[in-house]
């Protein structure tokens, strides 16, 4: 693979499943004067989970891709990509990332007998799938009709993404007249969602034997 196609499938054993994770939070409280206070918050987090390659063969049935009733050792068990007797390289695993960023600002002010709260928030949620190595077709090699070994990315990972952006702005004013309190306000909210999915978008090949 490395010599003929310039593709490194990764290791077949001995690789670590440890994944990075971090969280960051920052906050500023500013008392501008007696009638004005400003609060700003920022947070960011990142998680990354390592997963086995998907066992799905959508839109085909398992029996179409893996017709064998026995696994590679001759025993009765799973015959698909996650069969116990099968061997897949490091590149066949995928990582489910979870990235979240948020920003919020709040301004509290007083104007005579009126109290006002102006608030704005923005959040960005990004959950792509990533994998080891570059783009390459998914390749399954069978033995006796069951999964024997494979390399290349998980077939449902390339192009798989989910992104959500949300912005909210709110303005609320409160004033008093005697024993009565009155509140009026406005709110604006916008959301933008992006979802991507492409089964076997990099190609998927199944060989009956080595």
Residues of each region from the PLM?
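Ligand-site clamp/hinge motif
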Residues: 7-25
